[in-house]
Regions:
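Residue-level detector of Asp-centered blade-edge/turn motifs that repeat once per structural unit
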Residues: 57-59, 106-107, 150-151, 194-195
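Repetitive beta-architecture junctions, highlighting loop-to-beta-strand starts
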Residues: 12, 61, 77-79, 121-123, ...
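Pro/Ala/Gly-rich low-complexity, hydrophilic intrinsically disordered segments
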Residues: 37-71, 76
């Protein structure tokens, strides 16, 4: 059932009913203001999806990406975010600097990405709730695709120096960087496994 209370807040209660056994499989509820109707619908859809598939939630998720626009000779690349179904798109950066390779933290509260300012690659951390960007480090040469450790406390990336590209790990609590590979080869695109 769903109804708007005296404060114009939607109150929702639902049951997932098995028509064969004539029993409720699960039930839940919640509330939302009129602007949050899509979000509560996504949360209910997630509840049902998880119950039937056993998979992780999907409908109440976001996508972070690079949006490129403008004339060919003055392209702007902006960090952007939207709901998984394409709604609620918004830009997170102005397009003044080149931005690349955004990645959500495991909590989805932060985004790590590359920012090229004055042709120098910087690894940045964007806090979604506040809109605050923090520069984590500047690295000479090329820097590639920072990715989060499953616990959210480290980043892994590739850094190119003196003709070699090696894998480095940054501790986000101390900002210390540790080199993990030391080869003359090109070691790039590192990623942590989910199961540690």
């Amino acid at each position: 059932s769903a109804y708007f209370d005296d404060d114009n807040v939607l109150q929702l209660e639902f049951k997932l009913w098995d028509v064969v056994t004539q029993k409720a499989l699960t039930e839940g509820g919640g509330s939302a203001d009129p602007a949050g109707l899509r979000r509560i619908a996504h949360k209910v859809a997630d509840f049902i999806y998880v119950e039937f598939t056993g998979d992780k939630k999907y409908f109440d998720t976001k996508i972070v990406y690079i949006s490129e626009s403008g004339p060919q000779d003055k392209r702007k690349k902006r960090l952007a975010i939207m709901d998984q179904d394409g709604h609620n798109h918004r830009f997170l950066t102005s397009g003044r600097d080149l931005v690349l390779t955004p990645r959500f933290s495991p909590t989805a509260h932060e985004i790590a990405y590359l920012n090229y300012f004055n042709d120098e690659p910087n690894i940045c951390l964007f806090e979604i709730a506040t809109g605050r960007t923090e520069k984590l480090g500047s690295f000479p040469g090329m820097t590639f695709a920072p990715r989060f450790h499953p616990d959210g406390n480290k980043l892994i990336m590739s850094l190119a120096e003196d003709g070699s590209t090696n894998i480095f790990e940054m501790d986000l609590l101390t900002r210390n960087t540790k080199q993990l590979t030391r080869t003359v080869h090109i070691d790039t695109a590192p990623s942590y496994s989910c199961l540690l």
